[in-house]
Design a protein with these regions (language model features):
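Structural signature of alpha-solenoid helical repeat junctions
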Residues: 79-82, 112, 158-165, 182, ...
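Extreme N-terminal leader/anchor segments
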Residues: 2-109, 325-334
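Long, ordered, amphipathic alpha-helical scaffolds
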Residues: 66-70, 75-76, 241-334
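TPR alpha-solenoid repeat register
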Residues: 116, 169, 203-204, 235, ...
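TPR/TPR-like (Sel1-like) alpha-helical repeat modules
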Residues: 128-145, 191-200, 213, 223-233, ...
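Structural motif corresponding to the intra-repeat A-B loop/turn of tetratricopeptide repeats
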Residues: 93, 97, 120, 124-127, ...
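Flexible helix-coil transition and linker loops at the boundaries of alpha-helical arrays
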Residues: 73-78, 106, 138-163, 194-196
């Protein structure tokens, strides 16, 4: 069991772009890093620092003026740590050696740059080194933020842009700890991140649900599933599996599995090896093979290690296909 790095350009938080193909929404996993969108927000936050506005309209007028007058594009911070962070935001849009070198330069400008450690950790192959780098990012962020903010802003943590490097470093650290078999530590971090930010902009709930289920902590898995109103292969198939493992074959578990089939009909085929390997894709498309491949890669072993669940899936899917063939004459008509 291992946990790959999954967010921003690999996973569940799903930075999205609209596809012109059939009105479906596609998610670019590798060629787009949504952290680049923070740059303007971060600059505006720096520009507004210390200013007081009497009304919301006054604040919006300032933001518009800042964007239109070139204040954002020409922002040159005085503080070394701000210059380092600005460089890191540019690094997020780069690839390979250029990205790494920009992160290194940012740390040369200021060691108070958690996101630079995050970039270096993401690009590191050795997992022990990943843990070390993510840990440095966490320690640096905690030192910069101070202790009071964690209690004061609990529940809204992601909404403060200065906290996001901390959240990213902790998220990465949890994944690296999981890969090292330190499941208790990984679980505590994911739970802490959801405690700080229940809205879960990062998508840590997906990792935590998977971890609960791998550890057979079904009560916590059930509670987490109930906290979020989700659609999609991850949530639907894991909900169906959890119902089977805790209650067996019931009307509720059968209904949940049928809902999962409607969410993505390719998951059973991939689980059972009835289709060949999928080509590498830069996208996750809801309901399509790339989403199914992403789910099976992360959660497939949960099904396969439970023979009864797999047999149940086969039986229910066969009946589902027969029903669709009768009503539509085609298995996968949308």
């Amino acid at each position: 069991m291992s946990m790959g790095q999954k967010k921003y350009h690999q996973g569940k938080s799903k930075a999205s772009r609209k596809s012109k193909d059939k009105g479906k929404e596609k998610f670019d996993l590798f060629n787009y890093d949504r952290r680049t969108l923070e740059k303007e927000m971060w600059i505006l936050d720096k520009l507004v620092n210390g200013r007081e506005f009497k009304t919301v309209e006054d604040a919006n007028d300032f933001y518009s003026q800042a964007r239109n007058s070139g204040m954002v594009e020409n922002f040159h911070p005085d503080k070394a740590e701000d210059r380092a962070q600005l460089l890191v935001y540019d690094a997020f849009s780069k690839k390979g050696a250029e990205r790494r070198n920009m992160a290194i330069r940012a740390l040369e400008i200021s060691e108070n740059c958690p996101d630079a450690y995050v970039i270096l950790a993401e690009m590191e192959r050795d997992n022990n080194r990943k843990i070390e780098l993510y840990g440095k990012g966490v320690d640096t962020a905690e030192r910069i933020l101070g202790k009071e903010i964690f209690d004061r802003e609990k529940g809204y943590f992601w909404g403060i842009i200065e906290t996001r490097p901390y959240m990213r470093a902790q998220e990465g650290l949890a994944g690296a700890l999981w890969n090292s078999g330190k499941l208790d530590d990984a679980q505590r971090i994911y739970e802490r991140l959801l405690d700080l930010n229940p809205g879960d902009n990062q998508g840590n709930r997906y990792s935590l649900l998977l971890l609960y289920m791998y550890r057979n902590d079904f009560e916590k898995a059930k509670k987490l599933l109930g906290q979020y109103d989700e659609d999609g292969a991850d949530w639907d198939y894991n909900r169906a599996l959890l119902l089977y493992l805790t209650s067996g074959i019931t009307m509720e578990s059968k209904s949940a599995l049928r809902k999962a089939f409607e969410s993505n009909r390719y998951v059973p085929l991939l689980l059972l090896g009835d289709v060949g390997p999928l080509p590498d894709s830069n996208y996750i498309t809801p309901g399509e093979p790339d989403e199914a491949g992403s789910y099976v890669k992360a959660s497939g072993s949960l099904w396969l290690k439970n023979l009864g669940a797999t047999k149940w899936l086969v039986k229910e899917f066969a009946e589902y296909l027969k029903g669709r063939e009768k009503t539509s004459g085609e298995f996968f008509r949308r």
